[in-house]
Amino acid sequence: MSSEIKRVFVETVVCAGAPGKEARFMRMLESRQTYKRRQDGCLAAWTGSSIDGAGMVLVQSVFVDNKAWKRISDDVMKALDTKDGGLESVLAGPPLVGMFEIDLEKLRLPQ
């Protein structure tokens, strides 16, 4: 990891799969996170499921900067959305989405 990077952009999404489409929803989310992790400019990407059984999913990705986030997001749309139709058809409702700027040292990402 470059020592020049001081602050990173963390994309945070909270969402749920549509009833009967949860398994496909999770596969699609995981494929997108795997794709992001392979791209230069993405430092980490993961998903987490709620522990209360409510079906909520936390999706987070860490990018070196806003330009990397934009480029990788556009690449995901071109590479995956065109093949599988995108996440909209498997979402239970609108996701809660936020982008946060965080000091890299606070994340303690592996080198």
Give the positions of each predicted feature:
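Short, well-ordered beta-strand segments in beta-rich or mixed alpha/beta enzyme
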Residues: V8-A16, A44-D75
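An amphipathic, aromatic/His-enriched active-site/gating alpha helix that lines ligand/cofactor pockets
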Residues: E4, S31-A44, V62-M99
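Basic/polar N-terminal segments that are highly enriched at the extreme N-terminus
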Residues: M1-I5, Q111
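Short, surface-exposed ligand-recognition loops at beta-strand->loop->(often short) alpha-helix junctions
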Residues: V14-R27
